[in-house]
């Protein structure tokens, strides 16, 4: 599917730094570029610029893994009127609040909706 950047409702880009998913405010660089891999059955894996995987653990925490962790590293990209939501195996969405903190939520709302850019 190719390289993507994801900009939150609050203007922050998802970013992978120091083995954590964070946000950058207002701009994007190599830390904010993710490679989206199609894994069939409407599921994708999201790899960082350093070839690590975005994942959600059993406690619903978003983390970066050095290895593909099966269902923990698979997501469904839901498209909503030109925006995208990133839904994990556990039916939780990756979200970014107004302060740029990353969390997961079971509810689909504006914090869990991103602009998707092809990079």
Swiss-Prot record:
Origin: domain of life: Eukaryota
One of the protein's GO biological processes: actin filament polymerization
Signal sequence range: none
Family matches, as Pfam families: Fascin (PF06268)
Sequence repeats: 34-47, 75-87
GO cellular component terms given for this protein: actin cytoskeleton; cytosol; plasma membrane
Hydrolase among keywords: no
Single annotated GO MF: actin filament binding
Family as reported in the entry's similarity comment: Belongs to the hisactophilin family.
UniProt-annotated stretches for the region Contains several HHXH repeats: 8-110
Post-translational modification: Phosphorylated.
Phosphoprotein recorded as keyword: yes
Known role: May act as an intracellular pH sensor that links chemotactic signals to responses in the microfilament system of the cells by nucleating actin polymerization or stabilizing the filaments.
Naturally occurring in which organism (per UniProt): Dictyostelium discoideum
Major subcellular location class: cytoplasm
Coiled coil: none
Localization, UniProt: Cytoplasm; Cell membrane
Origin organism lineage: Eukaryota, Amoebozoa, Evosea, Eumycetozoa, Dictyostelia
Lipid-acceptor residues (N-myristoyl glycine): 2
Keyword annotations of the record: Actin-binding, Cell membrane, Cytoplasm, Lipoprotein, Membrane, Myristate, Phosphoprotein, Repeat
Transmembrane portions of the chain: none
Name of the molecule in the record: Hisactophilin-3
Membrane topology recorded in Swiss-Prot or TrEMBL: Lipid-anchor
Alphabetical list of PANTHER family matching this protein: HISACTOPHILIN-1-RELATED (PTHR33351), IG-LIKE DOMAIN-CONTAINING PROTEIN-RELATED (PTHR33351:SF1)
Region (2 X 13 AA approximate repeats): 34-87
Name of the gene encoding the protein in the UniProt record: hatC
């Amino acid at each position: 599917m190719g390289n993507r950047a994801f900009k939150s409702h609050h203007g922050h880009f998802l970013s992978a730094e120091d083995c954590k998913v964070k946000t950058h405010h207002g701009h994007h660089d190599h830390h904010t570029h993710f490679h989206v891999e199609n894994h069939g059955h409407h599921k994708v894996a999201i790899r960082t610029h350093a070839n690590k995987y975005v994942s959600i653990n059993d406690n619903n925490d978003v983390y970066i893994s050095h290895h593909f962790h099966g269902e923990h590293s698979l997501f469904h990209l839901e498209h909503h009127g030109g925006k995208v939501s990133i839904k994990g195996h556990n039916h939780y969405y990756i979200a970014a609040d107004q302060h740029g903190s990353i969390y997961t939520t079971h509810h689909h709302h504006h914090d869990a909706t991103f602009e998707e850019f092809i990079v």
